[in-house]
Regions:
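Mature extracellular/periplasmic domains of secretome proteins
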Residues: 183-188, 245-249, 267-291, 301-319, ...
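Extracellular S/T/G-rich loop segment that most often corresponds to the catalytic His/Ser-adjacent loop
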Residues: 197-199, 317, 332-419
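Active-site core segment of subtilase-fold serine proteases
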Residues: 105-255, 275, 282-286, 372, ...
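C-terminal subdomain of the subtilisin-like protease fold in secreted/lumenal serine endopeptidases
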Residues: 286-294, 300-303, 308, 315-317, ...
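Short helix-loop-beta-strand segments that form the rim/entrance of peptidase-like active sites
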Residues: 247-267, 272, 422-436
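Active-site environment of divalent metal-dependent phosphoester hydrolases
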Residues: 202, 325-330
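Autoinhibitory propeptides
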Residues: 2-36, 41-136, 141-166, 350
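A cross-family glycoside hydrolase active-site/sugar-binding cleft signature
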Residues: 91, 260, 291-295, 322-323, ...
């Protein structure tokens, strides 16, 4: 239940309440008490001027940025520091893009600006778009969906209205044979896709991934189904495992390394993400893709994360990021950073209504009811629905929707191109995304055909 603000508007609440604050009227989230700056001494001086008795403390060093903790009001301090010419920003919190129409971004209800642009009142849905081949075919004929990644069998609706995970077990009748056969094919000198997400399933890993080149970066990068111990699947549990399976389906044999930067509730602090990006081991950067299926809005821009992304890009690494599920044209980060391959979602008949859009979105790929790997043998406390279907009993496969899953499809397409054509990641982007002859949807970019 959302809490009431003094003005009567609902205040976002949820599993992030103790570790996330929301900026009223601005639609972004941040870590309470934390500011990132390139001038820790200058920022400390501003903090002491504002709150004489407060003692802020220096935290981690993140490249040129330093984490300052113990701040009474991060938004006030960041604003005053910027007025003094100091680079400073809140430690933004970003969320997994895994819950379409839920709403997907908890900060969106903080103010009118975050989701104020109705998707159906934009050029994305203008008449000329509907004349394209994406809309001219049915789900079985569309080249975008002629792949085992997309499950065509309808699945039952969730019986409970309680917001938990939006992942659903693969229903009876969905053929996972072709998807399973895509795993375990090892290419010569495979490219690497690095996934920053909720981690990778440990002992609950699906059998389809047991003999492949998918692995967690360390023992600490483990995805878990129910970290809060309430008996229900957490909202973003399995997110990283699902994404890793998508990459392997599209690009068999690709080395997939999964890092944990998000909680199973779906939130992750910018400082933790920046530290992970800065510490990545990239032995062959020109054949490496980083896939990010999270994002959010920012005070102005997430400068610390942009530094980390630009650093990787300068090495030759390609960064792919999901555009978000807010149904808005407002840019989200990291997808909107320069040079990032930002990815929106399409369904079998055109743009997914939940997908973010705009000139900053470079590509789109299937993102509705995708079939991929999930926890094997997990059965939560969700009661069976009126059709007798257990909606949180998983056997290693699941259906999920969101731009979170469109991004790894594109990352996989790039990895497959690198392996097949012996090219760099940058050259793969030119062929898969930037080639002028490719089909495009206004405000959603190039349609990435995953056949």
């Amino acid at each position: 239940m959302a809490q009431e603000k003094p003005d009567g508007r609902p205040r976002p609440s949820g599993p992030w309440t103790d570790r996330v604050s929301f900026a009223d009227g601005a639609g972004f989230a941040y870590v309470p008490g934390s500011v990132l700056t390139t001038d820790p001494e200058g920022l400390t001086a501003v903090a002491r001027r504002l709150w004489e008795k407060d003692r802020v403390r220096t935290g981690r060093t993140l490249g040129p940025f330093t984490e300052i903790a113990g701040v009474r009001d991060p938004l006030v301090l960041a604003r005053e520091a910027r007025l003094a010419g100091i680079v400073a920003q809140p430690d933004h919190v970003f969320f997994a893009h895994c819950e379409p129409c839920c709403p997907p971004h908890p900060a969106a209800s903080c103010g009118g600006g975050a989701g104020a642009n109705p998707v159906y009142a934009t050029p994305v849905y203008a008449t000329p778009v509907y004349a394209t081949p994406v809309y001219a075919t049915d789900v079985h004929a569309s080249p975008v969906y002629a792949t085992p990644v997309y499950a065509t069998t309808a699945s039952p609706a969730r019986a409970s209205g309680v917001r938990r995970s939006s992942a659903r077990p693969a229903p009876e009748g969905v053929d996972t044979t072709s998807a399973t056969e895509a795993f375990g094919v090892v290419a010569e000198g495979p490219p690497r896709v690095i996934v920053l997400d909720t981690g990778f399933a440990g002992t609950d890993a699906p059998g389809a991934l047991s003999t492949t080149t998918v692995r967690p970066a360390s023992a600490a990068d483990v995805d878990a189904p129910d970290e809060d111990g309430n008996g229900f699947l957490d909202p973003a549990s399995g997110h990283g495992t699902f994404i890793a399976g998508l990459v392997q389906q599209v690009a068999p044999g690709t080395e997939v390394v999964v890092h944990r930067v998000l909680s199973t509730m779906g939130d992750g602090a910018e400082s933790n993400i920046v530290q992970c990006l800065a510490d990545l081991e990239v032995p062959d950067p020109q054949r490496t893709i980083v896939s990010l299926s999270f994002g959010g809005f920012a005070l102005e821009q997430a400068f610390a994360m942009e530094w980390a992304v630009r650093r990787l890009q300068a090495m030759g690494v390609v960064v792919v990021a999901s555009a978000g599920n807010d149904g808005s044209c407002r840019p989200t980060f990291p997808a909107a950073f320069p040079g990032v391959v930002s990815v929106g979602a399409v369904g079998p008949y055109g743009p997914a209504p939940f997908s973010n859009y705009g000139p900053w979105v470079r590509a789109c790929a299937p993102g509705v009811d995708l079939l991929s790997t999930f926890f094997d043998g997990y059965d939560g406390k969700e009661p069976p629905g009126d059709r007798g279907v257990d909606t949180d009993k998983f056997d290693g496969w699941a259906l999920w929707s969101g731009t979170s899953f469109s991004a790894p499809v594109v990352a996989g397409a790039l990895a497959r191109t690198i392996a097949a054509e012996k090219c760099t990641a940058a050259d793969a982007v030119k062929r898969v995304v930037d080639e002028p002859a490719l089909m495009r949807i206004p405000n959603l970019g190039t349609v990435v055909n995953v056949i």
